[in-house]
Amino acid sequence: MRKTLAVAVSLILLTGCSTSTPEASDGKMAQLTPPASCEQEIVIQAFADQVNGSRYVPTDWQPSPGTDLFDVYEAGGIACTYGIQVAEIGGTVMWASNVDNLWDRKKTEWLEQGQVQIDLPGINETDAVILKEGSTSADEMHVWAINLLINDVWIQVGATFLQNVDEALPIVQSAIDSLS
């Protein structure tokens, strides 16, 4: 009886010491990667929940050097637009692995451009910066964007219809959930 109790207690204690973070076979933490395709149902649904009728909008990107889009593609990432194309309402989500310290280089640029550090509520990100809420460009179009680093993947969410962090969180979470 004592032996059985000792084994049971040991198993309970060992189970309590385990982690839910996946590990690779070599004992290192498993690396998450950006999605390979833009047709991420969870992301499409997150946009549709805020802008009824949203869908993935195939886009023929022509990235210019020095832009976030260019850097995403250089890092082997993808950029995807979701929304209602004819109404010109929607947003773009970009994913890229943090290769060659990409995040630190980009973060320096973003801070110099006026983005500010933020801690996203309910998200366990490594780092995040946001384009100030309610920013407008020269033509008065509303602009809102957030950049975050999570599990060594850079995610950028930008949209014309978002006004604040709370509105963006479901889309941000869907972008995180699409990592594999």
Label each region the model flagged:
Residues 79-101:
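A short acidic-to-branched-hydrophobic micro-motif
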Residues 18-74:
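N-terminal "mature-domain start" segment
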Residues 37-41, 100-101, 162-166:
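Soluble non-cytosolic domains of exported or imported proteins
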Residues 32-33, 90-97, 157-162:
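Second-shell loop/turn segments in exported
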Residues 13-16:
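C-terminal motif of bacterial Sec signal peptides marking the signal peptidase cleavage site
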Residues 1-11:
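N-terminal export and membrane-targeting signals
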Residues 60, 103-145:
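Short Gly/Thr-rich strand-loop-strand
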Residues 131-180:
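Extracellularly exposed regions in secreted/surface proteins, prominently low-complexity, repeat-rich
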